[in-house]
Amino acid sequence: MEKDMTKGRPLPVILKFMLPLIIGNIFQQLYNMADTIIVGRYVGADALAAVGSTGTIMFLTVGFSQGITAGFSVLTAQRFGAKDTEGVKISVANGILLSLIFTVIISSLSLLGMRPLLKLMNTPDNIFQDAYTYIMIISAGIIATIFYNLFSSYLRAVGNSKIPLVFLVFSAALNVILDLVLIINFKMGVAGAAWATIISQGVSAILCLVYIYIRMPSLAPNRRHWRLHGQESRNQLAMGIPMALQFAITASGTMVMQSAINLFGSDAVASFTAASKVQNLVTQGMMAMGQTMATYSGQNFGKGDIKRIRQGVKASLEASVVYALAAAVLVCILLKPALGLFFTGNVDMNSMLPWAKTYIYMSVIFYIPLSSIFVFRNTLQGCGYGFLPMMGGVSELVARLVVAMISMAVGSYALACFCDPAAWVTAAVFTGVSYLFVMKDIRRKYERPETATSEK
């Protein structure tokens, strides 16, 4: 089922498209949490810390792949909005072929550089081997993640956010089952958690591809489309690489933050990991709003309706503020009971809770600027402006780097936790100003005369 987001009142259209994305994102976080909870309870706190210590590296590799595939699908959304059926099929086939190339590159670099990277990040010795085992399996199976993200992005590009949700729910259930079987029954430890993630995402990717060919003929390429088109590749890379680099740059900043956290020992790492999982869960609405705005702005940019893009941004910002306030209250309420899910009874929660509270209580104050980043960044990307969001990632990196270096110099865990808020405020200001600049640039260069006339 396709969804034309160039018609109807912006807010209801956005919220209707966004709802399945929120549910899907929450399920994705739940099965990520399932890995962590099952590892923490059935393998131990050190194993939990090991998995958690690789989170920022996963953000780097998985985030890069998400960025590149999302960039490839921007052209699909724009052509769908412009009713260019042939262009849609060409963009899909070309994106798949380019993704195969990037799969080989990302896997090779990850496998070759993982051990030095873990050492560079101050990974504690008592969790190093488990961390290395977990992230190596994830890196080897990155093809499953890349192609699930790619096919889901294509479905969302034409307005279908429900089917990716269905497959994600199935994947989440499969992941939990595999976690229990591989970790508890087969005693595979962190390796079992990694394999459960890869297998479940691979199944979802296959289901998405089958659905596209059976139920979405407008997306399914024919034999003549299966080749690398030079201009198409340049266009997709011009959009995908900046988006991928934006993820990679942001991830580099979180890796610096993780390095600072690692200096405080495995208890701090385990507590921070659990707290960040809870925070990631309640902030998924912000991410879903961003994903929605990428499709919304892409389709409307393809149609040439710039006024409608601005209306959508205004509505989404207002909704995001309400969500950010609700999320801040919710995470504070859930933190203590949720933290207990990650650890067995022989772990002293009184020693774990202060680490988690410090991070969460400092972060919730800045949820509003965090929510605005997703709106501005994804709107810019949907309109084909990839460079400025990438530079927004650079601003996050600089902010995290400065705060992390100071925290390591003075030995302050609280200051290390401030890395995220500092990055959010910096990026919110940068992307907000960039959005205003781009809207003026678009109106001057691209807005259709009839649209401009109707606004006078």
Regions found by a protein language model. Give the residues of each.
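Transmembrane helical elements of multi-pass membrane transporters/channels
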Residues: 16-35, 137, 171, 200-204, ...
